[in-house]
């Protein structure tokens, strides 16, 4: 039972609210480190050199770090209703992706009218299909390529775990990790063999992020 005295909640209720709003600042720091890595890796294109890859080869792991941070907050409660989890991810990742794709497409179309030659045409293929297998169609939205692989890795992780849970199979966590590492190695192998165009590119990206 809860009650208020002079507008103040009971101590237990205040503690409960504080716990719900508790922030893990370790992951805030990890996100900040990953952002700095991404910025440093792309500064050369603007004439500023912040690249320290000669000291530490970070360019292959900064987005993987984002994937790790996202996966850390996965809750087993999602395994009870995986359909709801999928709908949530569609709402928070895929729908916004298509929203900003349309916005960037309209901006690029406007720039074309002003004489700027940047990005592709504003058509159904570039709006609906290209975000799934490339993500570079309007140039200005190039960073959006990461959304689909992240979405697929999160969905596959949930679906695989939910399948085993419903079967009643207790799979040790190290087996999940070992399998994911093998999948990631398969993605690297496909990339080395130059299977990294069109839909193959999407597959390689998903496989690469699987271990994280």
Across the structure, where does each feature detected by a protein language model lie?
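Membrane-cytosol interface segments of multi-pass membrane proteins
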Residues: 1-183
